[in-house]
């Protein structure tokens, strides 16, 4: 809608490292964006991938420091009612994990971090939404941008890395390398959120993104590891990490 076009314009004027809108045609809700040269971070390998994660974190830190556009909605994915609905859907589809899902939901809702400062969130942070070129990363796909705590974006990425390890796409060592590169680069540009907030939003993202999408998008590997993913989220919430 028109708000998407206006939001892209405002985001592009507030941050230099996002895709630039060229034209918005309201009758057809058509938004034309500038072509972004480079490679999606998801397509990089080895050391280039590590550097891509660092660049993505730096771009995200700059995005979080930008002025918040007036049209942005509030980030709601981790609201208690949304988390409860995720749990309900997961338990309905997979009664065998209902108990651990409900325990996670209760623990999340009883430990919601307070006093989190609000920033301009990307809202859909993953390696396909960053284009790397000569050490710099441009953020794309801004349609889920919202106002919320920085830990929501960071936790989403950490949850994805954890998911990729748990289903066997990457090793535990590689998960930690990429997570460290991501967080260290962010910290080099902007103060990291408190560890408690980061752990909470990582656990919330494992529930509301990784576990839920395994169910409603029928992802076989996620479904196979669903019980472990939910247990991992509880462990991350309690201790900040998972032993392996």
List where the protein language model places each region:
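A conserved alpha-helical element in kinase catalytic cores
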Residues: 1-27, 44-62
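Regulatory N- and C-terminal appendages and interdomain linkers associated
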Residues: 2-4, 28, 95-99, 137, ...
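Conserved hydrophobic "DFG−1" position in protein kinase catalytic cores
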Residues: 23, 34-35, 127, 131-132
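Active-site acidic catalytic loop and adjacent metal/ATP-binding pocket
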Residues: 108-152
């Amino acid at each position: 809608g028109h708000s998407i076009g206006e939001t892209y314009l405002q985001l592009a004027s507030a941050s230099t490292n996002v895709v630039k809108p060229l034209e918005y045609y309201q009758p057809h809700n058509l938004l034309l964006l500038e072509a972004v040269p480079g490679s999606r971070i998801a397509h990089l390998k080895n050391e280039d991938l590590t550097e891509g994660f660092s660049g993505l974190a730096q771009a995200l830190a700059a995005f979080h420091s930008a002025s918040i556009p007036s049209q942005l909605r509030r980030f709601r994915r981790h609201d208690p009612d949304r988390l409860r609905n995720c749990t309900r859907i997961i338990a309905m589809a997979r009664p065998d994990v209902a108990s651990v899902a409900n325990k996670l939901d209760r623990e999340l809702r009883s430990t919601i971090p307070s006093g989190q400062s609000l920033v301009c969130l990307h809202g859909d942070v993953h390696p396909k939404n960053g284009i790397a070129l000569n050490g710099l990363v441009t953020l794309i796909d801004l349609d889920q941008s919202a106002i919320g705590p920085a830990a929501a974006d960071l936790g989403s990425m950490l949850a994805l890395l954890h998911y990729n390890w748990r289903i066997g796409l990457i090793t535990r060592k590689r998960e930690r390398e990429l997570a460290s590169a991501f967080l260290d680069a962010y910290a080099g540009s902007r103060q990291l959120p408190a560890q408690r907030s980061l752990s909470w939003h990582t656990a919330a993202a494992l529930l509301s993104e990784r576990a839920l999408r395994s169910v409603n998008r029928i992802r076989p590997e996620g479904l196979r590891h669903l019980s472990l993913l939910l247990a991992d989220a509880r462990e991350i919430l309690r201790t900040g990490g998972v032993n392996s």
